[in-house]
Design a protein with these regions (language model features):
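Boundary at the C-terminal end of the N-terminal hydrophobic targeting segment
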Residues: 37-41
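Short, surface-exposed loop or secondary-structure junction motifs
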Residues: 77, 137-380
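Structured C-terminal helix/loop/strand segments within mature extracytoplasmic catalytic/sensor domains
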Residues: 385-433
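N-terminal secretory signal peptides
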Residues: 1-12, 22-25, 30
Length: 433
């Protein structure tokens, strides 16, 4: 039987991306990988190369890949290792990886395309599209009770984009609301076909419409617009996009982002024909890598209940680099404009409600834009996010610097990989760490 494991199973609560004001970037591909319009650049990034080699040679990870771009065109690539333990296929720019929450910025940008076209507004109540959210309630004691009072504020698009809607997340939420989420299939994400000891399995709702309807019947953790709480808001946003656009969410992504940007290796279900370039996912346990989702039998080979806008994508470094390159150029790539310059800049700006900060959270010290973190201070203008299986990506439109780093292990906080990666990149490109 296929087991769809609740995201809490292998995802560290603070392991999605501990950016801490640091940038993250890198790339990995083996010198033996077939040439497909890219070139190995390990000599340009000695720190990244050394660290990647250390992770792989010590058996901590089978393969790592990163891309770093500082101008238009193809990025530099650094790659070490293979697609899985005991395998000989080297990782390369077209290898497929589970990027989990790095799906969120893609969904956020999809919503901003509709804002650009006037089909949605940032501060428009989502109840205009999903009437079931017109009369929400808010828990009075979220960790201990389901007692709730009527919400004073309507959930808006801005709230969904910035995790300030007051929604929960099965990987973070506690108490009786967590059980209600599990009972109702409010678990938009998949990890493994197999049960994981000590973790609760819960199948997602059968479709995104049911997901929205069931979620609307459950209380919020906080009043909308008052607190930053990492949540399922980007998954719900997929349903808002469907109604606002009149298109299936996944079809909208393909038509408005993937196809225009020539992102030909981005999926929510990995085709059988592409298994040969799909990596396996591992859980490090007492120094040993345990395969929780082998590529050959991956749960991602099955059609998901729906396209999870918060954690469902499988993609290549080449594809995600093209997404970032479009953002670096404020909405345009290779002569194809995805959104206006003004809207692209808006999407990567701090969209948090005026009274909300990320203080006291794992995103502390940053703002939040359309599904991704926004740097402040010396990192002002940097936009990006990470994934639960060790991936991370960012773009700085001011300098045109962009980077994607791919790894595949859970929980991501087992190793300091995502945090350290920033230091390696900064050192290799000549910036003080």
């Amino acid at each position: 039987m296929n087991m769809q494991v609740n995201g809490q199973a292998m995802i560290g609560r603070r392991g999605f991306l501990t950016w801490g004001g640091q940038l993250a970037a890198a790339g990995a591909i083996s010198a033996f990988a077939p040439a497909r319009a890219w070139a190995q650049a390990v000599d340009l990034y000695p720190t990244i190369r050394t660290q990647f080699e250390s992770y792989v040679s010590s058996g901590k990870l089978p393969g790592l890949l990163a891309t770093i771009g500082r101008a238009a065109g193809m990025p530099d690539v650094v790659a070490i290792g293979t697609q899985g333990l005991g395998e000989t296929t080297p990782v390369n720019i077209d290898t497929l990886w589970r990027v989990y929450s790095m799906t969120k910025p893609v969904t956020g940008i999809a919503a901003m395309i509709l804002v650009d076209e006037g089909k949605m507004k940032l501060d428009q109540p989502i109840a205009d599209f999903l009437p079931e959210f017109a009369n929400m309630t808010v828990l009075t004691d979220p960790d201990n009770s389901m007692d709730a009072v009527p919400a004073k504020t309507q959930i808006t698009l801005r709230h969904l984009l910035t995790h300030t809607a007051g929604l929960g997340y099965s990987i973070i939420t506690k108490g009786p609301l967590l059980q209600a989420y599990l009972d109702n299939g409010i678990t938009p994400g998949i990890v493994s076909r197999f049960p994981i000891p000590g973790q609760t399995a819960s199948a997602p709702t059968p479709d995104i419409k049911t997901f929205s309807e069931r979620l609307a019947k459950l209380p919020l953790v906080a009043e909308p617009g008052t607190k930053w709480i990492y949540s399922i808001s980007l998954d719900l946003l997929g349903r808002v996009i469907e109604v606002a656009s009149g298109m299936d969410f996944e079809a909208f992504l393909k038509a408005r982002i993937f196809e225009p940007l020539k992102m030909t290796s981005s999926y929510f279900q990995v085709p059988q024909s592409e298994i040969k370039r799909f990596v396996s996912n591992y859980a490090p346990v007492n120094g040993v890598l345990f395969p929780i989702d082998p590529a050959s039998t991956s749960i991602y080979l099955n059609k998901p209940a729906f396209a999870f806008g918060g954690a469902g994508m499988v993609t290549s470094a080449r594809d995600y680099d093209r997404f970032l390159n479009m953002l670096a150029n404020h909405g345009e790539l290779d002569g194809v404009r995805v959104m206006s310059t003004a809207t692209a800049k808006l999407a990567m700006s701090d969209l948090l409600p005026s009274a909300v900060t990320t203080d006291g959270t794992f995103a502390e010290g940053a703002g939040f834009g359309a599904g991704g973190r926004v740097g402040k201070g010396m990192n002002a203008g940097v936009f990006g996010w990470g994934g639960a299986a060790g991936t991370v990506a960012f773009v700085d439109p001011r300098t045109k610097l962009r980077a994607v780093c791919m790894a595949q292990y859970m929980p991501s906080n087992v190793y300091p990989f995502q945090q350290d990666f920033a230091k390696w990149v900064l050192k290799d490109i000549g910036f003080p760490a």
